[in-house]
Swiss-Prot record:
EC number: 3.5.1.110
Species, as recorded: Escherichia coli O157:H7
Record: active site: 24, 133, 166
InterPro entries from the UniProt entry: Isochorismatase-like_dom, Isochorismatase-like_hydrls, Isochorismatase-like_sf, RutB
Function, in words: Hydrolyzes ureidoacrylate to form aminoacrylate and carbamate. The carbamate hydrolyzes spontaneously, thereby releasing one of the nitrogen atoms of the pyrimidine ring as ammonia and one of its carbon atoms as CO2.
Gene: rutB
Keyword flag Hydrolase: yes
NCBIfam families attached to this UniProt entry: RutB
Reactions catalysed according to its record: (Z)-3-ureidoacrylate + H2O + H(+) = (Z)-3-aminoacrylate + NH4(+) + CO2; (Z)-3-ureidoacrylate + H2O = (Z)-3-aminoacrylate + carbamate + H(+); (Z)-2-methylureidoacrylate + H2O + H(+) = (Z)-2-methylaminoacrylate + NH4(+) + CO2
Family designation: Belongs to the isochorismatase family. RutB subfamily.
Protein name per Swiss-Prot or TrEMBL: Ureidoacrylate amidohydrolase RutB
GO biological process: nitrogen utilization; uracil catabolic process
């Protein structure tokens, strides 16, 4: 068992019965010219987050944790996004951006597009699981719950973008399904101003889970290896 120093208190878990979840580290969310950038969100400080995710993934894999990668998006015709009868049609900033800029239709979060692809620095390895998801939460209309339960996994460590949207949504849904969720705060980034990052982390550590950081996580998994991994 491993004890991880976290807020509001330490949490103990078995790495081999836990998963590291990388949420939507796609060009859409982390790269200039991607959806968030085109929609007016600041992605200029995502590079350190990518590096921290690399470090966390390396440590988690070495400790025997399952690595799960999510890619958010829809088919090229956006049928999976829902039509006017879906609130997603009205609230998705990607869909709204394409309605305002028709030349982007078919380019944002469409499966097979550059926007949909994971960033170059983050590459799933054999044994990892890659899942598409059509909404903010990784539990909605995906096999995530059955994948985890079939492996006896109850502890989930979250990284990625956006803390206040897909990361928090997935962690909250996991909480309702009796999963223990931890966020590595320096391996996440918000969509919006800095205060929403702080608000999301406050919500998580106060109501739904735990908050730690990459160095503490790596040191808990293997106290002598963090310097080498980093």
């Amino acid at each position: 068992m491993t004890t991880l120093t976290a807020r509001p208190e330490a949490i103990t878990f078995d790495p081999q019965q836990s998963a590291l979840i990388v949420v939507d580290m796609q060009n859409a969310y982390a790269t200039p010219g991607g959806y968030l950038d085109l929609a007016g969100f600041d992605v200029s400080t995502t590079r350190p987050v990518i590096a921290n995710i690399q470090t966390a993934v390396t440590a988690a894999r070495a400790a025997g944790m399952l690595i799960i990668w999510f890619q958010n998006g829809w088919d090229e015709q956006y049928v999976e996004a829902g039509g006017p009868g879906s609130p997603n049609f009205h609230k998705s900033n990607a869909l709204k951006t394409m309605r305002k800029q028709p030349q982007l239709q078919g380019k944002l979060l469409a499966k097979g597009s550059w926007d949909y692809q994971l960033v170059d620095e983050l590459v799933p390895q054999p044994g990892d699981i890659v899942l598409p998801k059509p909404r903010y939460s990784g539990f909605f209309n995906t096999p995530l719950d059955s994948i985890l339960r079939s492996r006896g996994i109850r502890h989930l460590v979250f990284t990625s973008i956006a803390t206040n949207v897909c990361v928090e949504s997935t962690l909250r849904d996991g909480f309702f399904l009796e999963y223990f969720g931890v966020v590595l705060e320096d391996a996440t980034h918000q969509a919006g101003p800095e205060f929403v990052q702080k608000a999301a982390l406050f919500n998580i550590e106060t109501f739904f889970g735990w908050v730690s950081d990459v160095e503490t996580f790596c040191d808990a998994l293997s106290p002598t290896s963090f310097a080498r991994i980093a």
